Structure formats: structure tokens, C-alpha cells
């Protein structure tokens, strides 16, 4: 076994990883995504090394899913984010990560700003230029 000074910690930006993993590897269940993350970290740890590296811990940093109630201006109704599919998926994903050996979940805090709907820059530009109408917007 490697000595303490030879062990490696891996830090994962959870928000970035989730978006990139979904783009690169497609939709997965929370358990499959947790397995994928662990395997990905182990492959990265040993890539390009003649010696097998020793993992100290994987630190996964992410904010807990939002529980806010926000107004959807297109549907003209309140949306409880705590009851969303994304909230359920994130909660199950965090639970799956916590069951993994050598994985530590570090949760940040949700920003007090946010929690409102925002238009993508290209959509806003099209609205201002008259190439799109408010009625054409969808969720």
C-alpha cells in the first residue's frame, strides 16, 4: 500500500460533471451515473502511469437541489422545485454517491439570488430584434 504522501485525492466539480456527463454519455439513472463517476475517476487516476496510483478519496462538490417555489412566466404558474424530477434524481444521485467507498460528498449552499426563469442570450437577442415573439416561447 502507498504511504500517506503517495495517495491521491480527486476533486470533482459536481455541477460541471453532471452537465458534461449527460452530454457525453447520455441520460442515466442516479446509480448508473454514480458508478460512472467512480469508474471515470479511477481510470483518470491510473492513466499514463506505469505504477498504479493509490486513491485517498474522491471529493464531490455540489449544491443540494433547490427546494424553492418559483414562478414560470410562460406557463403562468408556480413551480415547486422540491417536487421536480430533477430534485428526485439529484437526491437519489447523492444517496448513491454516499454509499460509495472513498467518496465524500461536500455540499455547498444555494445562492440567494437565482430561482427565477431566465432567457438564453440568443433567445433574448431574437426577441429584441423582432425575429421571435413572446408567444413562441416554450418551456
Task: Give the label of every model feature segment.
Residues 1-139:
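Domain-level signal for Mg2+-assisted phosphodiester chemistry and nucleotide/NA-binding surfaces
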Amino acid at each position: 500500500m502507498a504511504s500517506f504522501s503517495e495517495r491521491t485525492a480527486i476533486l470533482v466539480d459536481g455541477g460541471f460533471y453532471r452537465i458534461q456527463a449527460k452530454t457525453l454519455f447520455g441520460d442515466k439513472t442516479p446509480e448508473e451515473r454514480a458508478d460512472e463517476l467512480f469508474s471515470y475517476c479511477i481510470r483518470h487516476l491510473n492513466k499514463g502511469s506505469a505504477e498504479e496510483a493509490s486513491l485517498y478519496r474522491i471529493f464531490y462538490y455540489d449544491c443540494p437541489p433547490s427546494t424553492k417555489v418559483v414562478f414560470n412566466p410562460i406557463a403562468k404558474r408556480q413551480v415547486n422545485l422540491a417536487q421536480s424530477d430533477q430534485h428526485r434524481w439529484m437526491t437519489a444521485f447523492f444517496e448513491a454517491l454516499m454509499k460509495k467507498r472513498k467518496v465524500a460528498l461536500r455540499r455547498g449552499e444555494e445562492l440567494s439570488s437565482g430561482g427565477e426563469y431566465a432567457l438564453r442570450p440568443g433567445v433574448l437577442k431574437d426577441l429584441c430584434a423582432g425575429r421571435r415573439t413572446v408567444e413562441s416561447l416554450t418551456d
